[in-house]
Swiss-Prot record:
Protein name, per record: Octanoyltransferase
NCBIfam families linked to this entry: lipB (TIGR00214), PRK14342.1 (NF010922)
Subcellular location: Cytoplasm
Source lineage: Bacteria, Pseudomonadati, Pseudomonadota, Gammaproteobacteria, Enterobacterales
Superkingdom, natural source: Bacteria
Active site, renumbered: C169
Family matches, as InterPro entries: aa-tRNA-synth_II/BPL/LPL (IPR045864), BPL_LPL_catalytic (IPR004143), Octanoyltransferase (IPR000544), Octanoyltransferase_CS (IPR020605)
UniProt-listed Enzyme Commission number(s): 2.3.1.181
A Gene Ontology term for the protein's cellular component: cytoplasm
Originating species: Escherichia coli (strain SMS-3-5 / SECEC)
Pfam families assigned: LplA-B_cat
Gene3D superfamilies listed in its UniProt record: Bira Bifunctional Protein, Domain 2
Amino acid sequence: MYQDKILVRQLGLQPYEPISLAMHEFTDTRDESTLDEIWLVEHYPVFTQGQAGKAEHILMPGDIPVIQSDRGGQVTYHGPGQQVMYVLLNLKRRKLGVRELVTLLEQTVVNTLAELGIEAHPRADAPGVYVGEKKICSLGLRIRRGCSFHGLALNVNMDLSPFLRINPCGYAGMEMAKISQWKPEATTNNIAPRLLENILALLNNPDFEYITA
């Protein structure tokens, strides 16, 4: 089925705001014939404050900008070496509920890390993916007219120190992890294809077309 096809865009390293704007425009203007898309991107350093975000969780932003986002959740950090995957899916067409999509994204990351020999798990009380007690992947979504946008952010080989300037996802003292702590050779270039392969498998292996911007 043609509409089952997914366009995959590799966007490289980009500022947060133009990508967020493009994601909103895509979602606002799509119709029933619009193909779903997955965007793979890294962002320049930025704190994003989710819809539920409270100012007290931003401790010392310093020179890193703080941008309001309409995704679910609290404050998080994006920076180079973190693989962000935005999922622009027509949930009605794919017969997915919101909770099912959250579970699917978490399982995508768990499966990707398992391939690398890293045992990870989701938590019922705090969305995302964890290795032991440390958070390695953040997750935040928005649904509009039955279509999802925003997505997940997987820490690959980034500098984790900016997370100390916030209470990540609203949890004071939440420790963060990255793949390179276990696999020093990990980069977004070699993790992104695994992440994509795993999410497509969980979406029942639709046809896809890879587009590099």
